[in-house]
């Protein structure tokens, strides 16, 4: 096989020797004290196939060991991490970033052209200050609305977890808790995220993660401007405990005059009132799904007046615009019982009117010529003509059969009648 005179096999000057890797916060791990091994010219870059210095480390407890996959030249050309190949500024795949910045990839694929392009990029990197990307990425606009909405600045350390144990999936793992791999159910093999390629990630072609993020960006919600022109207040949620009044003012003062800033620490939110409606609309448009302070993505919404909030709750619509469906199975509203005008002032519990029982006045003697009936159980038996079709008359309370007990307190067996069995007097 014919090779060029400047190929990596003979040109050892192109081999890379570095002292520290270019990593993102997620790949580096949450532990600030890590032990990292360095192997000079340990492997060849998976993009340009040049030998480079390989770094290997463990990002945390119960995490898998990670190492650099591409050389620093390829990393600087795309401004990506040497391990995960995600953008260092936004934490997004290269395909998503290039789509948001309208940058077209022009990296050659053949061996000779790739080597020539790499040497030119190394020369450009050496002549730069090292603070900005080189090539087409350095000439692109600084930011994009889509990138600010999709940016993932918070580290996601679960990405460093060990791989799934293939023996456990087959039911043959005998290590138990000492197994360094995860004992979890694998993902669906038909899932497009299960098939990822490092070269597709670097060149931004057919990246399943990028396709998923781009589809999410196309269906991203928008912040509608309220019809009430008197509303000039914005709701800022998810503040946490570190966001202060001055930090909010430093961000929102550029959109217009701020009248008041009210921070509710208990709810971790704030209300920012602007002097004009135009300033509030500009702040909402420029900050919706883009506001990041102290590494926290804040939620921006329009404030609502008390009248609009009460109307929304009455119509079954929440503050976020979600319509609540009625709960099935509940009875409808019952009409109030009919109450006369005389009892309306004293019927506090809306009870049905009942006939008042006859009360015997024991303090006054009966009028002359009137004989009072004896109490129940003390007089002679009274015989009435019974209608065979009439329902039976219920017995009085004292003569009701003992088997009908509706509450535990009505049971005579549980009212201390047999306390002598337990050692009582």
UniProtKB/Swiss-Prot annotation:
Residue span of region Disordered: 304-331, 384-425
Residue spans crossing the bilayer: none
Locations listed in the record: Nucleus; Cytoplasm
Superkingdom, taxonomy of origin: Eukaryota
The protein's name: Pre-mRNA-splicing factor RBM22
A Gene Ontology BP annotation from the UniProt entry: positive regulation of RNA splicing
Listed Pro residues bias regions: 389-399
GO cellular component assignments: cytoplasm; nucleus; Prp19 complex; U2-type catalytic step 1 spliceosome; U2-type catalytic step 2 spliceosome
SMART domains given in the database record: RRM, ZnF_C3H1
Domain RRM: 232-305
Keyword match Nucleus: yes
InterPro entries assigned to the protein according to its UniProt record, in alphabetical order: Cwc2/Slt11, Nucleotide-bd_a/b_plait_sf, RBD_domain_sf, RRM_dom, STL11/RBM22-like_N, Znf_CCCH, Znf_CCCH_sf
Annotated PROSITE patterns: RRM (PS50102), ZF_C3H1 (PS50103)
Keywords noted in UniProt: Cytoplasm, Developmental protein, Metal-binding, mRNA processing, mRNA splicing, Nucleus, RNA-binding, Spliceosome, Zinc, Zinc-finger
Domain notes: The C-terminal RRM domain and the zinc finger motif are necessary for RNA-binding.
Source organism phylogeny: Eukaryota, Metazoa, Chordata, Craniata, Vertebrata
Pfam families per record: RRM_1, STL11_N
Family: Belongs to the SLT11 family.
GO MF terms held by the record: pre-mRNA binding; U6 snRNA binding; zinc ion binding
Record's subunit section: Component of the pre-catalytic and catalytic spliceosome complexes. Component of the postcatalytic spliceosome P complex.
Function: Required for pre-mRNA splicing as component of the activated spliceosome. Involved in the first step of pre-mRNA splicing. Binds directly to the internal stem-loop (ISL) domain of the U6 snRNA and to the pre-mRNA intron near the 5' splice site during the activation and catalytic phases of the spliceosome cycle. Required for normal early embryogenesis.
Zinc finger intervals, C3H1-type: 159-186
